[in-house]
Amino acid sequence: KVIDEKNVILFIDEIHNIVKAGGAEGAIDCSNIIKPYLSRGEIQIIGATTYEEYEKVFSTDKALKRRFQIISIKENSREETLDILNVLIPIYAKYYGKNVSDGIGKFIVECADKHLPNLSFPDKAIDILDNSLALTKKDLLTFDEIKTCMKKIYHVDLDFNFNYANI
């Protein structure tokens, strides 16, 4: 159906998983099925993966590698992430039917930057906001609820005696 439509671009998240996907020993895997369609221009695909996974997996399949072009997306800065959060906080708060304390965005960015180094901005900050609002039973999301979320979801024990409002 995608081939017949001609105006469809497929998006495959974690595209590195198509190599060897569904292929038992000696069988055709997903990447080998799509290669002819890609080479003839019958389908267009955008895939997302990390640079490390791309190099690890696509480097083993030269034919597939030459059918894709790398587009690097840099991680957002702390400042850009805070700008994004400031837009999203009222939207998420309304969705969850909660209010949010002043300064929560900056606090979330600080927590994400310091305690979740293996994840990327803005995703890690948005996840903290989303998870904290989902977990809290109170009407107001405060620093304490963020601390509770960080402990419960991310297993990060923030210092409960520190005055985070001064960040």
Locate the predicted segments by residue.
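AAA+ P-loop NTPase nucleotide-binding core of proteostasis motors
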Residues: 1-167
